Curated annotation (Swiss-Prot):
Cofactors required: FAD
SUPFAM superfamilies (alphabetical): FAD/NAD(P)-binding domain
One Pfam family from the record: GIDA
PROSITE patterns assigned to the protein according to its UniProt record, in alphabetical order: GIDA_1, GIDA_2
A Gene Ontology biological process term: tRNA wobble uridine modification
InterPro entries: FAD/NAD-bd_sf (IPR036188), GIDA_C_N (IPR049312), MnmG (IPR004416), MnmG-rel (IPR002218), MnmG-rel_CS (IPR020595), MnmG_C (IPR026904), MnmG_C_subdom (IPR047001), MnmG_C_subdom_sf (IPR044920)
Residues holding NAD(+): 281-295
Binding site for FAD: 19-24
Similarity annotation: Belongs to the MnmG family.
Covalent S-S links between cysteines: none
Name of protein: tRNA uridine 5-carboxymethylaminomethyl modification enzyme MnmG
Record's keyword terms, sorted: Cytoplasm, FAD, Flavoprotein, NAD, tRNA processing
Length: 626
């Protein structure tokens, strides 16, 4: 009798996902829902889907990504809708290209809900473990080994390790080996990746203190309630209006706050005499030390946000710091409303390892080890939404590869997810990457309102979107097209009643008859205001929304679609079996970069830093001659 044998179903899987954060959740759901026996192995099953930093989902560009995840069949949007306690549409004074939802979530409920859904998911098992080694045979992944020496076999492995690879926490000059306060640090896995040939770097992030609600004087702050309008992140859920029980609050730092920060900089692991933190932090989420040192301002905004319904802890958005605890409490008590504040958990910075994402294909599969995928902060990104999107794509593509089917690679012109992944694998990262609307050159096409129209076909294609929902999208598209064509032919007379209405809306009266579609192109005019002029009134609010946007922004949208068409002629020109050292007239830098990145198309090659238009011309000439 062999005492150490185990049943096959205990250690043999088709897909293993390492890490139970936002990337790991989506990867595991995608794999299991596509029918593959999946293991989610995580260092703390009680912290699955934990909001390690701000208790919020969405935001500028990020909110659109959550909608895209939902359209592809992911879970983040649905769980956000179930657990949000305050939600607002951002940038409502601007055009639809930059509008996005942001929700405060009950972080405890969010984590519990995600864990329950994962536990209930068919084909999926959650298990405790800290992975120390990747098992490889003949250049192909075959499994992992955990810190107990237990091995697990699989045909594909997805690494979603967050900030835990050699994670190290800093509070002043005090340090602790952990990827998150009160959690562990995974030390062996980085060494395994380095041995396999991966280039590894180090980044830094941070989080603010959590403070006690009853020690806050909200009377000195500005209240921010949830929107009065109903909202939902998920296309599967009915929009709802939330109760105004959990407002956020706005306050600010003071000159006295800044003086304390400057006085304590000598003890800062970032700016002190001994610079303990060498890694680069996120440009778009700087610590309060960075703000005070780099920006000459009297004050900086602070958003005071509830962490959940059943907790007294509040999150201080905008006050990330790694200053010593004494500096933290003194500085906080100089802020209006926080004069008597009590800290529940101190702020801290954390350093962690990431891999160079140019070592990945656009599918998020490694170029070095076959069937090994990476998603989330291990790829150099920051943010729950960015991580979840990568996890979903990695999970889908791992499943498609095991099926022997073509992978999904989303274009820059059809999704923010496509923009992000293309940026990562083509340009790489020298600081934590955050999605911004400015990164998307076709952002007017990538709106909050049309994510399902853009991406549901892919979700349905891989089996993550049900047939009834896909049929609903097809029907919606047909209705939009039908009604726009119809409205182009609905005549509106230049009558006194019509002109009185137009003047009341603040727009020019008619001198002659026109078409209803032409009137709807005016920025001041809504369909509902002119609905009585339509012989076939539209009641579907989704159809009305799309008609108004498509008509009002028709010129811009058509111009952008023309740009996309020109761009995609090159984007779709594949680079197959090209030995770049044999391409004449390439610059030395371009040759080195092309050899490293191994772009799959001329479009991808053109976006590699250091590759010039002359290099692209040389490459095009060579490919055409072949």
């Amino acid at each position: 009798m062999n005492f150490f044998t185990r049943p096959d179903d205990d250690y043999r899987f088709e897909v293993i996902v390492v890490g139970g954060g936002h990337a790991g959740i989506e990867a595991a759901f995608a794999s299991a829902r596509m029918g593959f026996k999946t293991l989610l192995i995580t260092g703390n099953p009680d912290n699955i889907g934990w909001a390690s930093c701000n208790p919020a989902i969405g935001g500028s560009a990020k909110g659109i990504v959550v909608r895209e995840i939902d359209a592809l069949g992911g879970e983040m949007a649905k769980t956000t809708d179930e657990t949000m306690i305050n939600v607002r549409m951002l940038n409502t004074s601007k055009g639809p290209a930059v509008q996005a939802l942001r929700a405060q979530i009950d972080k405890y409920s969010y984590s519990r809900t995600m864990k329950r859904k994962l536990e209930e998911q068919e084909n999926l098992l959650i298990r405790y473990g800290i992975v120390e080694e990747i098992l490889v045979e003949n250049g192909k992944v075959k499994g992992v080994v955990d810190s107990f020496g237990i091995d697990y076999m699989a045909k594909a492995v997805i690494l979603t390790t967050g900030t835990f690879l050699r994670g190290k926490i800093f509070i002043g000059r005090e340090t602790m080996e952990a990827g998150r306060m009160g959690d562990f640090s995974a030390r062996g896995l980085t060494n395994s990746l380095i041995k396999l040939g991966f280039t590894v770097g180090r980044f830094k992030t941070g989080t603010p203190a959590r403070v006690l609600k009853k020690s806050i004087d909200f009377s000195k702050m500005v209240r921010q309630d949830t929107d009065d309008k109903p909202w939902a992140f998920s296309h599967f859920n009915e929009p709802k209006v939330l109760e105004k029980d959990y407002p956020c609050w706005l306050t600010h730092t003071t000159p006295e706050s800044h003086k304390i920060i400057r006085d304590y900089l000598i003890f800062s692991p970032l700016y002190g005499e001994v610079k303990l933190i060498q890694a680069k932090g996120p440009r778009y989420c700087p610590s309060i030390e960075d703000k005070v040192v780099k920006f000459e301002r009297e004050s900086h905004q602070i958003f005071v946000e509830p962490e959940g319904k059943d907790t007294q802890e509040y999150y201080l958005n905008g006050l990330s710091t790694s200053l010593p605890y004494a500096a933290q409490i003194k500085m906080l008590r100089t802020i209006p409303g926080l004069e008597n504040v009590k800290i529940v958990r101190p702020a801290y910075a954390v350093e962690y390892d990431y891999i160079d994402p140019t070592q990945l294909y656009p599918t998020l599969e490694s170029k070095i080890i076959e069937n090994l995928y990476f998603a989330g902060q291990i790829n150099g990104t920051s943010g729950y939404e960015e991580a979840a999107a990568q996890g979903l794509i990695a999970g889908i593509n791992a499943g498609l590869k095991l099926r022997g089917e073509k992978p999904i690679v989303l274009k820059r012109s059809e999704s923010y997810i496509g923009v992000m992944i293309d940026d990562l694998v083509t340009k790489g990262v020298d600081e934590p990457y955050r999605l911004l609307s400015s990164r998307a050159e076709y952002r007017l096409l990538l709106r909050h309102d049309n994510a399902h129209l853009r991406l549901a076909k892919y979700g349905y294609q891989v089996g993550l979107i049900p047939r009834w929902f896909y049929d609903k999208i097809i029907n919606l598209e047909n209705n939009i097209k039908y009604h726009i064509e119809r409205l182009e032919n609905v005549k509106v007379p230049a009558s006194s009643s019509v002109n009185e209405l137009l003047q009341s809306l603040g727009t020019t009266p008619l001198t002659e008859g026109t078409r209803l579609a032409k009137l709807l192109r005016r920025p001041e005019v809504s369909y509902n205001a002119l609905k009585h002029l339509d012989p076939e009134p539209i009641s579907d609010t989704d159809v009305i929304e799309q008609i108004e946007i498509q008509l009002k922004y028709e010129g811009y949208i058509n111009s952008m679609l023309e740009q996309v068409q020109i761009f995609e002629e090159y984007e779709n020109l594949p680079i197959v079996n090209v030995i770049f050292s044999e391409v004449p007239n390439l610059s030395t830098e371009a040759r080195e970069k092309l050899e490293k990145i191994k772009p799959l198309s001329i479009g991808q090659a053109s976006r590699i830093p250091g590759v010039t238009p002359a290099d692209i011309l040389a490459l095009l000439t060579y490919i055409k001659k072949k």
